[in-house]
């Protein structure tokens, strides 16, 4: 029996899909990427934006009509009602996001890095976000169990573990919080990198940044869920921080870990966003040493407060503002990549054929010569930059 996995959305969705895939393989299933060969499709969806939801719905409709004999299993952050499936029996939720986190002991081995899901759900009430509808209240995986799981990943040959969750800043178990977890994971094996997923600006972020700086094997990359540089818009979004808090987190990270990769999420065209608000976001991006950004035009999600707000910003304006932010970050990312010329970087090899991989700062890097094993960590001296990709010579 063959199973085909189709996954949309964030790292958390990917982590859950990889774990489910490993569980299926352990039970004797064979993975396939060819739709025509599949006996079962597992679609892990995403409804965070209308675009993601539409892409997911189109795929599900296509699979249902072209391969009616195959089973279809739908899970993840997807609005089942929006699918308009005429045969309800085709909808088989693979796991409820309101249950406890998975206790599977099967270790996924297909990817170059391991994904450690430490938390699920969210206690926030952001006016634009539909995720709590699917993932429920915040709950955290047991601290000791996570360390045991990380050891399994290390024993399986992984040299990078990505810490992921719905809202990492809410992690709490056995009187331990995210900074404690990062320190404990980093202490397991100096030869295994720890990469942190997105965190909210604020007190937890400041403590986590301090913990990151104390361990050389924690990747020098921080991604903040900023969303906007305007306090007025952040308040309307019900984000639990101000632009000042964003700046504090960024400046502390840059001070304690010079040269780190700094990313953020930014949204354009939130209801009521004026040119002045957008200018504040542009100013934040220019002023602070961000070198990566995920930029999204606002997408109305049915059932969220923001979907009913007045002051709607036209979709063309949302796109223009998103393009402006993208242009700003593109120039900053290129300058960031150029700053590594002549330096030595550590690369986790993802593609065995080309040797391409990623530095701890989340820059793509390719060797000029040599062959390398997937999942291995290789040190390279950067000799050239091509389209923000580092080219390097392996160190002897």
What are these regions (language model features)?
Residues 84-116, 160, 396:
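N-terminal [4Fe-4S]-dependent radical SAM core
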Residues 256, 275-276, 280-322:
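C-terminal, non-catalytic macromolecule-binding modules
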Residues 111-144:
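Canonical Radical SAM [4Fe-4S] cluster-binding loop centered on the CxxxCxxC motif
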Residues 10, 171-190, 300-331:
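Radical SAM enzyme [4Fe-4S]-AdoMet core and its adjacent flexible, acidic
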Residues 308-396:
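Terminal RNA-binding accessory module
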Residues 73, 155-276, 286:
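Conserved SAM/AdoMet-binding glycine-rich loop
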Residues 1-87:
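Cofactor-cradling patches in redox/metallo enzymes
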Residues 135-162:
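Conserved alpha-helical substructure of the radical SAM core
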């Amino acid at each position: 029996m063959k199973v085909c996995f189709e996954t949309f959305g964030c790292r958390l969705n990917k982590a859950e899909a990889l774990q489910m895939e490993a569980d299926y393989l352990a039970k004797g299933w064979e993975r396939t990427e060819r739709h025509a060969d599949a006996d079962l499709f597992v679609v892990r969806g995403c409804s965070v934006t209308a675009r993601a939801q539409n892409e997911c719905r189109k795929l599900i409709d296509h699979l249902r009509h072209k391969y009616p004999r195959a089973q279809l299993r739908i899970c993840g952050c997807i609005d089942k009602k929006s699918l308009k499936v005429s045969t309800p029996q085709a909808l088989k939720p693979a796991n409820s996001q309101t249950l406890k986190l998975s206790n599977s002991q099967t270790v996924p081995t297909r990817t170059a890095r391991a994904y450690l899901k430490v938390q699920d759900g969210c206690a926030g009430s952001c006016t634009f976000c539909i995720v709590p509808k699917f993932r429920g209240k915040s709950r955290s995986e047991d601290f000791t169990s996570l360390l045991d799981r990380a050891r399994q990943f290390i024993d399986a040959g992984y040299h990078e573990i990505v810490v992921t969750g719905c809202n990492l800043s809410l992690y709490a178990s056995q009187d331990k919080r995210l900074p404690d977890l990062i320190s404990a994971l980093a202490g397991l094996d100096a030869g295994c990198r720890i990469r942190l997923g997105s965190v909210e600006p604020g007190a937890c972020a400041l403590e986590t940044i301090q913990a990151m700086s104390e361990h050389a094997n924690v990747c020098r990359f921080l991604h903040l869920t900023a969303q906007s540089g305007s306090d007025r818009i952040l308040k309307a979004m019900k984000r639990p921080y101000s632009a000042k808090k964003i700046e504090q987190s960024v400046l502390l990270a840059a001070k304690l870990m010079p040269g780190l990769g700094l990313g953020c999420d930014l949204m354009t065209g939130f209801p009521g966003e004026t040119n002045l608000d957008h200018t504040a976001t542009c100013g934040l991006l220019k002023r602070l040493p961000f070198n990566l950004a995920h930029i999204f035009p606002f997408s109305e999600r049915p059932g969220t407060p923001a979907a009913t707000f007045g002051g709607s910003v036209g979709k063309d304006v949302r796109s223009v503002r998103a393009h402006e932010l993208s242009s700003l970050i593109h120039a900053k990312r290129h300058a960031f990549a150029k700053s590594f010329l002549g330096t030595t970087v550590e690369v986790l090899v993802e593609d065995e054929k080309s040797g391409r991989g990623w530095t701890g700062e989340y820059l793509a890097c390719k060797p000029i010569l040599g062959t390398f094993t997937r999942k291995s960590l290789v040190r390279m001296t950067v000799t050239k930059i091509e389209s923000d990709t580092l080219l390097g010579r392996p160190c002897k």
